[in-house]
Amino acid sequence: MFLFDWFYGILASLGLWQKEAKILFLGLDNAGKTTLLHMLKDERLVQHQPTQHPTSEELSIGKIKFKAFDLGGHQIARRVWKDYYAKVDAVVYLVDAYDKERFAESKRELDALLSDEALATVPFLILGNKIDIPYAASEDELRYHLGLTNFTTGKGKVTLGDSGVRPLEVFMCSIVRKMGYGEGFKWLSQYIN
């Protein structure tokens, strides 16, 4: 219940209690997308099979409504990602911070998303997951491998106004330890209209 109250408190304090948003959860397979979605929905950790088909969940926290789409991350599932870009309010892109051998593949997918015109103004929250595992990448290391060292907008309340700059930031987290992703969603919530 603590996580629910904490997450609600953050979003409510930012004036999101009457907003609705369509959020895509994207990233390679085994990055933690489904685990995060179920942690936000049910506050419980469950072993999941790889996502074979796109799923959506309605998340209600207080008066906040999110429609979250978990599209799977294996190569076949990535082919349908484009089908969900219409009217999306935000993208949460998860990266397995421990699986350094797949950073190049994750960068290619992220680059394709960031260069897609349909997502040109959509805020991106990049979560480096699994920091609870020894030798997982640091935030600086992940930024470097994803090519984001000088391309993020800043973690605080950053007013972008009409600058045309896409909100984009990296946060490190451990979904299984329930740490880090709350700060990421707090940052993201300021850009959801």
UniProtKB/Swiss-Prot annotation:
PROSITE patterns: SAR1 (PS51422)
Residues that bind GDP: 30-35, 53, 129-130, 132, 175
Annotated compartments: Endoplasmic reticulum membrane; Golgi apparatus, Golgi stack membrane
UniProt KW Repeat keyword: no
Keywords per UniProt: Endoplasmic reticulum, ER-Golgi transport, Golgi apparatus, GTP-binding, Hydrolase, Magnesium, Membrane, Metal-binding, Nucleotide-binding, Protein transport, Transport
Record-listed E.C. numbers: 3.6.5.2
Region annotation Mediates recruitment to ER membranes: where it falls in the sequence: 10-14
InterPro entries: P-loop_NTPase, Small_GTP-bd, Small_GTPase_ARF/SAR, Small_GTPase_SAR1
GO molecular function: GTP binding; GTPase activity; metal ion binding
Database matches in CDD domains: Sar1
Motif annotated as STAR, chain positions: 2-4
Binding residues annotated for GTP, in chain numbering: 30, 32-35, 129-130, 132, 175
Membrane topology term: Peripheral membrane protein
Subcellular location, principal: endoplasmic reticulum
Activity regulation, free text: Small GTPases activation is mediated by guanine exchange factors (GEF), while inactivation through hydrolysis of the bound GTP is stimulated by GTPase activating proteins (GAP).
Family label: Belongs to the small GTPase superfamily. SAR1 family.
PANTHER family per the UniProt record, alphabetical: RE74312P
Name listed for the protein in its UniProt record: Small COPII coat GTPase SAR1B
